[in-house]
A protein has these predicted regions:
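Short, well-ordered, aromatic-rich surface patches in folded extracellular/luminal domains
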Residues: 28-44, 101-223
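Short amphipathic beta-strand/extended segments with alternating polar/hydrophobic composition
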Residues: 53-57, 75-80, 123-134
């Protein structure tokens, strides 16, 4: 069951406030339009989520908005590491900043959701839309953004369970563990803070605490 909208907005606001405090002042020293930005958008009606939009600047700052189409837009700030940021822009360069690009296979296949890549810099804008592509660079870029979608969803679900559904924390940690095992999370170290809090909090069930500690240990050992 999806959480009440006010609870989800509370989680997003809390994460946004904490992130704004933590971000270096230099990140806001220049106008956002000064930094090249890559945007990924996916619209897939009757799925969950139906709408995803992730924006990443060349500084590694950005926003994510993951929701159903009927929900109010609620983009929240987030950051990614320098290596992942560099990889996103390397792939974008290989794809000519999406200028004059045709990625779709143009075959009769199932609707997998409309995806959009967009590049913006100082008034320059290029974008490409597709349902399915065989282009290797585009597939790699898509996998990164799909992974970020999964990662931010896992993080929000875990933090929501910690606040409002303590008995559901074990299920949330187990989902993070499953996604980590399948190598779906581009930066699993971003989940260490909530995992550590679960592991140290005696108000959560023992199995959740044990699982969180074990997963955090694995992530630290690998990253």
């Amino acid at each position: 069951m999806n959480p009440p909208a006010w609870k989800y907005r509370g989680i997003v606001f809390a994460r946004a406030a904490a992130l704004l405090v933590a971000l270096p002042v230099v990140a806001f020293a220049a106008s956002p339009s000064d930094a090249p930005t890559v945007t990924f958008r996916k619209i897939f009606k009757s799925s969950y989520p139906e709408f995803v939009e992730i924006k990443v600047t060349q500084r590694g700052t950005g926003t994510y908005d993951i929701r159903q189409l009927d929900d109010e837009a609620s983009p929240a700030p987030f950051v990614i590491g320098a290596p992942l940021t560099q990889r996103i822009f390397e792939l974008t360069t290989k794809l000519r900043n999406f200028q004059g690009l045709d990625l779709d296979v143009h075959r009769r296949i199932a609707n997998l959701g409309e995806k959009t890549f967009r590049y913006e810099k100082a008034g320059e804008t290029h974008e490409v839309k597709f349902n399915y592509t065989l282009d290797d660079s585009a597939t790699q870029l898509l996998n990164i953004f799909e992974g970020l979608t999964r990662q931010e969803s896992d993080l929000s679900n875990l933090e929501r369970a910690m606040r409002y559904d303590r008995l559901g924390v074990n299920d949330a940690v187990r989902q993070v563990e499953a996604d980590y095992n399948q190598k779906l999370l581009p930066e699993p170290e971003r989940l260490l803070s909530p995992l550590d809090r679960v592991g140290a909090d005696t108000t959560f069930v023992d199995i959740a605490r044990q699982r969180a500690r074990a997963l955090a240990t694995r992530i630290r050992a690998a990253h």
